[in-house]
């Protein structure tokens, strides 16, 4: 059996992500993580790399942001043997929630989490498919901290390294890890 290095896994993952020009609007080069999901070897490699990085790190919960964060966060939580907590748009969670609003380029949005999903002392790993400006992840970290959880780490499949998200989260005391980096412009 051939041993695959982490660098080879990262290259496989990067090569599985399709770039779509002029989507969703002219001038944007969209990085399509759904093409990674279509490749079972690349998808498995992404989960394995994330799980291996955080195994034995003391993580007690994994939080995934709507919606593609669920696709990576839930399997990583299973691999780590910890619970998975979804962060969703308003009105999608059935139990009592708390919410956090955040600014977008043109307007604002809101995220919610079940108010009983995180306990004081939980060491939470946040996972999403992509880090761009960091607004969604900043709101997610604020929700977790309001419930008493600690967030030291956030992991992504893709980091659009020139859009400022990593710096934004680092400023909140969150260490960012991504499997692949692309320019955002």
From Swiss-Prot:
Its EC number is 2.4.2.7. It comes from Pectobacterium carotovorum subsp. carotovorum (strain PC1). It catalyses: AMP + diphosphate = 5-phospho-alpha-D-ribose 1-diphosphate + adenine. Signal peptide: none annotated. One of its GO terms (molecular function) is AMP binding. It comes from the Bacteria. SUPFAM superfamilies: PRTase-like. Keywords: Cytoplasm, Glycosyltransferase, Purine salvage, Transferase. Catalyzes a salvage reaction resulting in the formation of AMP, that is energically less costly than de novo synthesis. NCBIfam families: apt (TIGR01090), PRK02304.1-1 (NF002632), PRK02304.1-3 (NF002634), PRK02304.1-5 (NF002636). Pathway: Purine metabolism; AMP biosynthesis via salvage pathway; AMP from adenine: step 1/1. This is Adenine phosphoribosyltransferase. InterPro entries: Ade_phspho_trans, PRibTrfase_dom, PRTase-like, UPRTase/APRTase. Homodimer. It is an enzyme of class 2 (transferase). Pfam families: Pribosyltran. Belongs to the purine/pyrimidine phosphoribosyltransferase family. It is found in: Cytoplasm. GO terms for cellular component: cytoplasm. GO terms for biological process: adenine salvage; AMP salvage; purine ribonucleoside salvage. Its main location: cytoplasm.
């Amino acid at each position: 059996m051939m041993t695959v290095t982490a660098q080879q896994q990262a290259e496989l993952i990067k090569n599985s992500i399709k770039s779509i020009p002029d989507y969703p609007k002219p001038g944007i080069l969209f990085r399509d993580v759904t093409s990674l999901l279509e490749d079972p070897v690349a998808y498995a490699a992404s989960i394995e790399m994330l799980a291996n990085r955080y195994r034995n790190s003391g993580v007690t919960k994994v939080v995934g942001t709507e919606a593609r964060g669920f696709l990576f966060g839930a399997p990583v939580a299973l691999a780590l043997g910890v619970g998975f907590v979804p962060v969703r748009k308003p009105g999608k969670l059935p139990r009592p929630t708390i919410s956090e609003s955040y600014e977008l380029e043109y307007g604002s949005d809101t995220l919610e989490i079940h108010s009983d999903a995180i306990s004081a002392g939980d060491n939470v790993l946040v996972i999403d498919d992509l880090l761009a400006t960091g607004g969604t992840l900043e709101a997610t970290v604020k929700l977790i901290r309001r419930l008493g959880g600690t967030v030291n780490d956030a992991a992504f499949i893709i980091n659009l390294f020139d859009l400022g998200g990593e710096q934004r989260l680092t400023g909140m005391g969150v260490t960012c890890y991504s499997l692949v980096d692309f320019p955002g412009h």
